[in-house]
Amino acid sequence: MLKRLSMNEFPQDIFTEPQGYSVNTLENLGPLTGMAGIWEGIRGMDVKPKAQGPKQQAYVERIELQPIDPQTNGPQLFYGLRYHAHITKPDQVKMYHDQVGYWLWEPANDNLIHTLTIPRGMITMAAGKAKASDKQFELHAKEGDCDAGISSNPFLNYAFRTVEFHIQVSIHDDGTWSYEQDTVMKIKCQEALFHHVDSNTLHKIEEATPNPQARL
């Protein structure tokens, strides 16, 4: 998780933005560098909840991660990727899962942020730490956490409430990357928590487009 800073650990000057930083996002993504581009994964596996119990489902994924211009919050500076993941079952056209959001890295303190929004009425912001050279990292979110939390529509909270979210990303030497994701759910009338697990390995099919400022 992101380290919680006390008020006296934040800078007193909350308005002055950093100066002289590079505007080339692709050169400053740190641990996210190996994820930039357009990717395809054909061997995804999903373990999802059904009335009869857990069910395994294979899936095919296309995910596009494009660099954005550097973002500042006063003195805070992020480099990041905007992404769109589109998932279908093998040999089908119908959408199985769709997800948009951002991957962000803060070089000053190695903070990582992963935001995700899905069209079931759910959003999550997961957080973690990674140094620029790290090839594996984890991010986490938890229900009720104001820094790295989860918000769902009323029906999902009633029937399939997400209480935790975890993702581990691995950047591989062969140019691929993979993830293992665990969405921990409290399902109505079930005592034990359910681990909705997803995993896939992504192969690059197209390079990323430089961010707008870097193209000037």
Each predicted region: which residue ranges?
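Short hydrophobic/aromatic-rich beta-strand segments that constitute the beta-sheet cores
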Residues: 41, 83-85, 112-116, 138-141, ...
